[in-house]
Amino acid sequence: MSSGYKPGKKRIIQPIQPIKKELIDFHGCQIPKECEPYLERTNVSLIIKKGFINGMKNDAEMFCNEDLFELLMNELLNEQPGASFSSCVRQTANVATLPGVIKSLAMPDAHSGYGFSIGGVAAMRLDDPNAVICPGGVGFDINCGVRLLRTNLDDKDIEPHLAELADALQKNIPSGVGTTSTQTLTEKEMNEIMNEGLEWLVKKGLAWKEDLVYCEENGRIINSDPHLVSQKARGRGRNQLGTLGSGNHYLEIQRVDEIMDKEAAKQMGISHIGQICIMIHCGSRGLGHQVCQDFVDMCVSQSNKNEVDIQLTGVPFQSDNGQKYFKAMNAAANYAFANRGMISYHVRCTFEQVFQKSPKDLDMHLVYDVCHNIAKEESHLVDGKEIKCIVHRKGATRAFAPLNPVIPDAYKPIGQPAIIGGSMGTCSYMLVGTQEGMKKSFGSTCHGAGRKISRVNAMKNISSDSVVEEMKKKGIELRITDPKLAAEEADDAYKDVKEVVETCQSAGISRIVFKLKPLIVVKG
């Protein structure tokens, strides 16, 4: 199983196509000579200096170790004029030109995306009336996020039931492109869900009241307005509540494989190696995608198009259109909270069916639920002064420091949990936020492994059959709606998640608490 790319030390990579630019060696990699004066390598990051892109308001920073740095330089070297997306380095610099920006950052898992890189973080100061909110800085899957449930089961308890459990989960939780649930929501229910989020499920007896405590924003963002969500978006979400979707979304049954911080793990109810957990990764489905598309279209048609990159076109946050997008985005985010909550309901019911014990008896408590595609109003210290900001996190996880008032009381001594999913067949991690992260990254860390090669290139270079076979060899029960697409999510298509989380720890923006390995993977 090969992507055609093998990481190596100090490797000089040749361009895919001839580029008529003079090249220069930069820390063992070749880059266009014109870029070199504006790049600085530290032991944990790449600094992109003002001037790399005309109009940059300040330096930008990308957290990376040596191997991840190589990938960034390779992408910069090979970027082509007229391509759909610029290189991740250029996108991070582009964001530093936006009105009101305090700093543009990229996490170690960053890769090119629409407007912002996926893994991009940027805070805009709200004392600047021109500070923008940018749909391309949130992404199309609004409030894509991850939640982790724990159990009191061990791997030895679950091993005899792996195939049965995998089949039942695939049956009970629809996944794949355009999949629908058995329930079609009424207009009234849609409005309630987009307003109340996870609270709606609690009222219906489909989620536990304590789930609200262990969910970012308590599972409901107050400043939302469902009436700003178009009928087209509503139509796409009406029958998708409780569905996984496709792409990198998944449901995994995992075992705790290693505990690095026993005290922090204990606070989360994780006590020993072999303990079984459930990880759910999904977002707002077609509804969120359409909300983003509607407001991208609005921004481009009604605003001055961004001269650096049209994909970065946004609107002033405090303008009427800025507030409309923000409130519609929050409505979609509430739908995503409810979606993950509904999937959790089906997971709890499935475990009860297979193990003949109630979810309460199985200790199926929510450890935490995090967002990683969202923009939020927050306050951060900037040059010693507390500044109100709108913080964009696109493929990045909020990871606030210990004692922060917005995190649950149980986690105040350790910091906000940040759940980091690895590529299919590899490990995942639980991190917590740090005080240093509040200073360096607006309380943000990575969100996953991050793509190394595109889906198209993965399908060209990796055999889906070999991916499925490799999962079998690892003893992982894989349930995938379309096995022909398995190559898109192959391990070789992604960066090494271990390198990503260790880079975050080395940079001081988060700490590793424990590692999980998959036993069952359910994908679209």
From Swiss-Prot:
Cofactor annotation: Mn(2+)
UniProtKB keywords: GTP-binding, Ligase, Manganese, Metal-binding, Nucleotide-binding, tRNA processing
Pfam families documented for this protein: RtcB
GO terms assigned for molecular function: GTP binding; metal ion binding; RNA ligase (GTP) activity
SUPFAM superfamilies found in the cross-reference section: Hypothetical protein PH1602 (SSF103365)
Coiled-coil portions: none
UniProt binding sites for GMP: 248-252, 372-373, 421-424, 428, 447-450, 523
GO cellular component: nucleus; tRNA-splicing ligase complex
Annotated catalytic residues: 447 (gmp-histidine intermediate)
Enzyme Commission no: 6.5.1.8
Catalyzed chemical reaction(s): a 3'-end 3'-phospho-ribonucleotide-RNA + a 5'-end dephospho-ribonucleoside-RNA + GTP = a ribonucleotidyl-ribonucleotide-RNA + GMP + diphosphate; a 3'-end 2',3'-cyclophospho-ribonucleotide-RNA + a 5'-end dephospho-ribonucleoside-RNA + GTP + H2O = a ribonucleotidyl-ribonucleotide-RNA + GMP + diphosphate + H(+)
One GO process term, biological-process aspect: tRNA splicing, via endonucleolytic cleavage and ligation
Cofactor annotation comment: Binds 2 manganese ions per subunit.
Residues involved in Mn(2+) 1 binding: 141, 144, 249
Keyword Transferase: no
Residues holding Mn(2+) 2: 144, 281, 372
Miscellaneous comment as given in the Swiss-Prot or TrEMBL entry: Ligation probably proceeds through 3 nucleotidyl transfer steps, with 2',3'-cyclic phosphate termini being hydrolyzed to 3'-P termini in a step that precedes 3'-P activation with GMP. In the first nucleotidyl transfer step, RTCB reacts with GTP to form a covalent RTCB-histidine-GMP intermediate with release of PPi; in the second step, the GMP moiety is transferred to the RNA 3'-P; in the third step, the 5'-OH from the opposite RNA strand attacks the activated 3'-P to form a 3',5'-phosphodiester bond and release GMP.
Family statement: Belongs to the RtcB family.
Function per UniProt: Catalytic subunit of the tRNA-splicing ligase complex that acts by directly joining spliced tRNA halves to mature-sized tRNAs by incorporating the precursor-derived splice junction phosphate into the mature tRNA as a canonical 3',5'-phosphodiester. May act as an RNA ligase with broad substrate specificity, and may function toward other RNAs.
Quaternary structure (record): Catalytic component of the tRNA-splicing ligase complex.
Protein name, as recorded: RNA-splicing ligase RtcB homolog 1
